[in-house]
């Protein structure tokens, strides 16, 4: 028998079972079909581009009250059964979008209702928009709005029958023990020690049976005895997993300040105007690091909650979640839900259900939190909006900023973007004044609250250090800065955006660099595990560097394999040798934060230390607020500057400016030391002088001349296959179709005063081979405002699918590697 799903994950009350559906049609005569009272558009839960559109099904009279938009249903599709989701309902078949020409007599009925509505009609409309905007299937987009734990699956059993499998993740119930009114007056016998312990434990309120058993080593018999006497009562209540994300971080306090700065007041006033106008306008809060943007968010949310609406807050890094959630919960209590990938499946389900039930009115989390079922959404906030982590890496490859803007327009609520280094796209739209039918407004917050000032930035020219005989990874200014931190018992942050011990090994005899057997990627050496690891596919090989006789060059057999470059592990070792033992050295990168709550524990360790150095990759550069940090050091600022990516400079500037902002956030002044071989680079100069225009003026001129965003929209179409020729041929066919299409339409573009979309390539990717697949891509540059996705979708359908070849479309692409 197949179980049905309820909105909150638990089985519905028992009703007529869903009969297994035969895999093939039966030869026996069929009973007369039940009358159909309406029609539904059903998106099949089969993620293939060939089935990207919804299919029409009839709603039998027996399901008329249960079939709603958002319901999961069981349907026949061809010679199989499938689960699907209702996205539209109409009484006439012709009123369903795209189904006006269908014959009602040929429409199959829905076989069963598998769940109550899991998403709203507005969510279904946003799904359609996402599917068209990002050239993704409807089922892929719909899954974003579904409760965690998986959707129902229809599987074929050994006997040839199709059956429904429900998700394994289920809610749990806690048993709570509490005193009855009579229980407060009950006096246990003198010899009933356990009863006295239980009653004393319950005097301050209900306690779970689990906690009582842990405290007093099994209280089950005592609870039963007092329950029979009417002294206590036991109730089952839904447990909300994921609510215990407590933190000892001092920066997690959400106490409101005595007064807001002028910049904070202006930002809050602009957000309030956008809220009252109710057009879905966008407000960009452009505030220097430490200017108090979070307090603006908290104050804006207070007004939204007072109006009876809800709010969604996105943060870019899991490492920021504990700090942010702590501040929000200290202000708004347990009405705050948290949603990110490090939660267990059960915790995500419970947090989702807290939102769906209305128990939580504020959601804080990563980009996926945007799709939580908040009722009457009144405000969306995206903190550090410039961060690339808001771009989804797999289909549907949406950008949270763009989806949030569409949601804000539909829900008629403001979208607030906050950053000390706003993206070029956000700044350009604010300069235009309008985009996507709504107003974009920029509000500056140029000062820090209180007596805090921006840190002093010093450039350590590594060329000069080398010419003076220094071979250390630390320049003289940085070493002196660390010594001052130790003397004053303060704290420092060191950024190095390369994890591992050394970025690669190199043969000293032939120059060979070992690469991954499955990817065209150099392997990174990890000292702790003595492994070479591929950071593209995750493969690893045990290895011992010279003079170990077991490790040899794969090309010439030499034993002279040298560790080249620096990784965070190697810098950590050097710090331990250089600094006193009583200085805590805490490394924070992808390797040290694999475990659950690892980010929070490391930050709490840093916060609690008397004197400490926090060493890490880019995850330490964003949003962290530690007033005791007086020194920020950048070990090598040049890694990201010369990558083959037009956004390389912007990313480098964002990273350096953000990490510089970790210094001097309290009463003590801050200092930033940036080590570089390129002190004349506009990125380095802009950070050193706290003048963004030095970089942005140069960068925007380069992009305007080369036609890159924000002056065009950029689409990356990627094909990959185990067969190199197949992938290259497939992407070549798409390129020909697009060029032919736009060449024919060129007069229409010119008459409209618009540029013609361009096709660059195809060419092999920078990382040509990954996970044993050869990768080729082409780039499309489209005028802003032209819906290029429709043309790309049409060409993909014309080419069709090719066995063994996969294709992806990345609209507004960020990853071009």
Predicted regions and their residues:
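Inter-lobe coupling/hinge segments of SF2-like helicase ATPases
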Residues: 251-261, 265, 269, 279-728, ...
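Short amphipathic alpha-helix segments
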Residues: 726-760
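Short helix-capping segments at alpha-helix termini
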Residues: 332, 579-581, 741-752, 800
């Amino acid at each position: 028998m197949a179980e049905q799903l309820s909105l909150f994950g638990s089985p519905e009350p028992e009703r007529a079972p869903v009969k297994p559906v035969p895999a093939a049609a039966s030869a026996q005569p069929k009973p007369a079909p039940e009358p159909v009272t309406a029609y539904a558009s059903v998106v099949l839960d089969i993620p293939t581009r060939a089935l990207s559109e919804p299919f029409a099904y009839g709603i039998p009279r027996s399901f008329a009250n249960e079939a709603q938009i958002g319901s999961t249903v069981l349907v026949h599709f061809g010679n199989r059964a499938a689960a699907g989701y209702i996205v539209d309902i109409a009484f006439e078949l012709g009123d369903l979008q795209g189904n006006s020409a269908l014959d009602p007599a040929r429409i199959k009925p829905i076989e069963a209702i598998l769940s109550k509505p899991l998403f709203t009609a507005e969510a279904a409309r946003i799904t359609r928009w996402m599917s068209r905007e990002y050239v993704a299937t409807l089922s892929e987009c719909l899954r974003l709005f579904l409760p965690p734990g998986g959707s129902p699956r229809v599987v074929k059993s050994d006997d040839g029958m199709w059956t429904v499998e429900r998700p394994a993740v289920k809610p749990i119930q806690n048993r709570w023990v509490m005193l009855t009114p009579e229980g407060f007056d009950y006096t246990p016998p003198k010899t009933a020690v356990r009863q006295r312990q239980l009653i004393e434990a319950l005097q301050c309120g209900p306690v779970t049976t689990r906690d009582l058993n842990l405290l007093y080593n099994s209280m089950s018999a005592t609870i039963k005895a007092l329950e029979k006497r009417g002294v206590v009562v036991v109730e089952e209540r839904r447990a909300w997993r994921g609510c215990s994300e407590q933190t000892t971080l001092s920066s997690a306090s959400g106490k409101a300040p005595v007064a807001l700065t002028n910049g904070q007041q202006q930002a809050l006033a602009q957000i309030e105007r956008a809220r009252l106008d109710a057009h879905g306008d966008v407000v960009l809060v452009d505030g220097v690091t430490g200017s108090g943007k979070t307090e603006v968010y908290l104050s804006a949310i207070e007004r939204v909650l007072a109006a009876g609406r809800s709010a969604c807050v996105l943060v870019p890094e899991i490492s920021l979640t504990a700090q942010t959630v702590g501040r929000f919960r200290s202000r708004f209590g347990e009405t705050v839900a948290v949603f990110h990938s490090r939660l267990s499946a059960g915790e995500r389900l419970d947090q989702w259900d807290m939102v769906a039930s209305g128990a939580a009115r504020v959601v804080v989390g990563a980009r996926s939190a945007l799709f939580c079922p908040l009722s009457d959404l009144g405000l969306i906030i995206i903190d550090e909006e410039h961060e690339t982590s808001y771009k989804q890496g797999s289909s549907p490859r949406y950008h949270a900023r763009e989806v949030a803007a569409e949601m804000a327009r539909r829900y008629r609520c403001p979208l607030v973007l906050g950053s000390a280094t706003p993206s070029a796209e956000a700044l350009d739209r604010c300069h235009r004044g309008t985009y996507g039918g709504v107003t974009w407004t920029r509000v500056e917050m140029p000062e820090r609250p209180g007596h805090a000032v921006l840190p002093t930035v010093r450039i350590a020219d590594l060329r000069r250090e080398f010419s003076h005989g220094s071979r250390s990874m630390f320049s003289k200014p940085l070493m002196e800065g660390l010594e001052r931190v130790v003397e004053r018992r303060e704290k420092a942050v060191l950024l190095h955006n390369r994890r591992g011990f050394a970025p690669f090994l190199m043969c000293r005899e032939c120059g060979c660099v070992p690469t991954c057997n499955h990817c065209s990627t150099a392997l990174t050496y990890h000292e702790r595990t003595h492994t070479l690891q591929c950071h593209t596919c995750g493969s690893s090989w045990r290895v011992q560097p010279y003079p170990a006789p077991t490790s040899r060059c794969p090309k010439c057999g030499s034993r002279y394999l040298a560790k080249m470059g620096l990784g965070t592990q190697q810098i950590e070792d050097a710090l331990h040798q250089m600094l006193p033992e009583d200085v805590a050295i805490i490394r924070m990168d992808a390797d040290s934060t694999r475990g659950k709550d690892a980010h929070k524990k490391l930050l709490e360790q840093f916060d609690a230390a008397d004197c400490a150095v926090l060493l890490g990759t880019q995850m330490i550069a964003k949003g962290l607020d530690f007033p005791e940090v007086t020194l920020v050091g950048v070990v090598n600022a040049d890694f990201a500057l010369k990558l083959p990516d037009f956004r390389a400079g912007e990313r480098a500037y964002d990273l350096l400016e953000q990490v510089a902002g970790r210094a001097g956030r309290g009463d003590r002044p801050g200092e930033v030391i940036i080590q570089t071989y390129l002190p004349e680079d506009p990125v380095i100069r802009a950070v050193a002088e706290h003048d963004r225009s030095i970089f942005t003026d140069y960068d925007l001129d380069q992009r305007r001349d080369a036609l890159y965003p924000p002056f065009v929209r950029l689409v990356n179409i990627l094909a990959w296959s185990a067969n190199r020729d197949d992938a290259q041929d497939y992407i070549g066919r798409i390129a020909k179709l697009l060029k032919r299409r736009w060449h024919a339409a060129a007069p229409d573009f010119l008459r409209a005063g618009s540029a013609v979309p361009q096709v660059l390539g195809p060419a092999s990717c920078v990382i040509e081979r990954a996970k044993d697949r050869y990768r080729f891509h082409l780039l499309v540059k489209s005028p802003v405002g032209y819906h290029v996705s429709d043309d790309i979708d049409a060409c993909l359908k014309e080419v069709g699918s090719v066995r063994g070849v996969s294709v992806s479309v990345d609209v507004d692409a960020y990853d071009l590697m």
